[in-house]
Amino acid sequence: MRIKIPFFGRKSINGANVQVQVYSATDIGLRRANNEDRCVSLEGKDSPGFADAVMIVADGMGGQAHGEVASDMAVEGIIRRLADQPKDKTLPTGGYAELLGQVFREVNAEIYLESQGDTYRGMGTTATAAVVTGTRVHIAHLGDSRAYLLRDGELSQLTRDHSWVAENVEAGNLTLEQARVHPNRNVITQAMGINAEPAVQTKTLDLRDGDLLLLCSDGLHGLAGDDEIKELLQSGKPEQAIKDLIQRAKDRGGNDNITVVIGTVRRQG
């Protein structure tokens, strides 16, 4: 579990300050031999490049130890490219999300190249990243790991699952209940390493005082509904919420690795 001191981000153009505190944990679950999930939670001086805080979840796939290789490559590649950016880099609104999307495409190219060879053939990984700059958070996403925002007691999903069942729910071919038990529920349509040119989702949001950001792998959201997740997030401090979320997934069978990253926000001004 990462527990770090609060950090006040750089001043935005309107003079506001945002305090971000990040927490994370990953658990192998009850059914898997290896943990193929990876996560990052960095803030303040530990954050790479222009970022005031960074949160990443990657859920590897590919059999044997290949999923671990892919998720390692994803988080390391994202952090390395962010670290190459100047600390004082400034971009217009939307520019940071666009840059983060390009970072995802470059890291995907590395993983995709390895996945075409004999050693790591077929490996891939989901990747969801949230990067805080000033008073905004920028998100990039591939796969079915998720980013959520808890604001004013309401939990909203910020990312759209790149999965067969999600696309069929959106098209009206399946209900949410049918999707949860469908035999194709684990089929991913976009991820790092499986497409040469992935369709990276990106977005930018203004942060408000009291916001809570949650990133998680499907080992959590596949076993706990959004209402349950919201209840546990609101029930106590972030450190305890992470423990409770992981335990809830394990109580439901823990059939996958479980990873949770939380960022709490206090905004002044």
Where are the regions a protein language model picked out?
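PP2C/PPM-type serine/threonine phosphatase catalytic domain
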Residues: 1-269
